[in-house]
Amino acid sequence: MEDLYRKLPSVDEILREEKINEVLKFNKREVVKNCIREVLERYREKIRRGEVKKIDIEKILEDVVSQIEEKKKMSLRRVVNGTGIILHTNLGRALFPPQVKEHLLDIAFCYSTLEYDVEKGERGSRYSHVEKLLCELLDVEAALVVNNNAAAVLLALNTLAKGKEVIVSRGQLIEIGGSFRIPDVMLQSGAILKEVGTTNKTYDFDYINAITENTALLLKVHTSNYRIVGFTHDIATEELVQIGRKYDIPTMEDLGSGVMVDLREYGLPHEPTVQEVVKAGVDIVTFSGDKLLGGPQAGIIVGKKKYIDLMKKNPLTRALRVDKLCLVSLECVLRIYRDSNPVEAIPTLKMLTAKPSQLYEKAAILNKLVLTIPKVKSKVVEITSLSGGGSLPEESLPSYGITLEVEGFDTEDLERRLRIRDIPIITRIVDGVVTIDVRTLLEGDEEVILHALEEITGVCQ
């Protein structure tokens, strides 16, 4: 083993190799040196584990060149989503409609009217680009956009209830993902949490009995990422609004996924729409931009002007503000809601409402193409998709996909081979077989899958 360590070339020796000199013509010296160190460290580790029997200089040089090429790849890059999870948090959640692309590029590479009022020739507000649209679509007095829904809740609580009590049902103290919990957000806001009711049952008198002179807000949190079923009771939004008005206390509802389309029209379960909650009379409503709305990551706050004006003046708003790329993409999405059919134009909603017959046809076409590749077996199968992103937690969507088996690879090997490509193909393992759910495949993904399988089978030969 010691002999193998001694035979490993030094960084300087590798730098003098002709193959590396060629690489240095197109890469910074420090980058190349770092890659050499990383490769040598890997070899030392392999020697420690007894995996290296002899030192092959040519192989080391090849590994260095490969490491340099790997460094050039973007870390954040496109993937093929074959999981069937529409709002896959790890894969970027909502996809933008195609109409967003042109405007996004325009604003990214040109100066813009971000905070400039062209009519008055003076400074404007960055929020005006989407506030008018939100007010028009939702029939609200005012709106504000921050960088995510947790930030929206934080800002609202900090503005309206810092140092005072916020009453919320015990059954609504949710965790919103990444171990962030409503009580923790409330603590950071400076508001004082006052839990009422029980996990499964909360009544109007629970809220009424908890009201004191220190009560600043009545909060309702929509449990969009789970359901409590069975022996349960919760008060309706309208009832909470009535209590708030009777005791002159503002009401707020965190809707989470923030759908603006009645999903019952497409055979899906009822998910409260933003419009319904606004119509119920809630003073402040918060929801996400990148879930069922189908836009960018954002926390959207709508409601009474007097409360939102206070939030706009809060120094936290500056810390939580969104950039021009978020605003232009959100504006495009909101214009689709106003001017056309969002279910046809917004990818999230289009995938969510896709008919099983459409998905079967899509799977059959892909299966036919895959079967032309030697050493690959596949078939069309019925599977279930999920909406993901903490929305529609009880709903499994009937879908279709194809199974993949490649001669010479077991299930785990094939899944990994597809996953580690330049364009990663993320699949599911269903009943021990690699499976691609076609619901979440985009135009052009089929070609990526076919190319990957052709290369993989070439390796097998």
Curated annotation (Swiss-Prot):
| Major place of residence | cytoplasm
- List the cofactors: pyridoxal 5'-phosphate
One example of the protein's molecular function in GO is: L-seryl-tRNA(Sec) selenium transferase activity
Q: Which GO terms describe its biological process?
A: conversion of seryl-tRNAsec to selenocys-tRNAsec; selenocysteine incorporation
Pathway terms, separated by semicolons: Aminoacyl-tRNA biosynthesis; selenocysteinyl-tRNA(Sec) biosynthesis; selenocysteinyl-tRNA(Sec) from L-seryl-tRNA(Sec) (bacterial route): step 1/1
Q: Transferase as a keyword?
A: yes
Q: Which GO terms describe its cellular component?
A: cytoplasm
Q: Tell me the keywords, alphabetical order.
A: Cytoplasm, Protein biosynthesis, Pyridoxal phosphate, Selenium, Transferase
Protein localization: Cytoplasm
Say what the protein does: Converts seryl-tRNA(Sec) to selenocysteinyl-tRNA(Sec) required for selenoprotein biosynthesis.
What name is this protein filed under?
Answer: L-seryl-tRNA(Sec) selenium transferase
Q: Which organism is it from?
A: Caldanaerobacter subterraneus subsp. tengcongensis (strain DSM 15242 / JCM 11007 / NBRC 100824 / MB4)
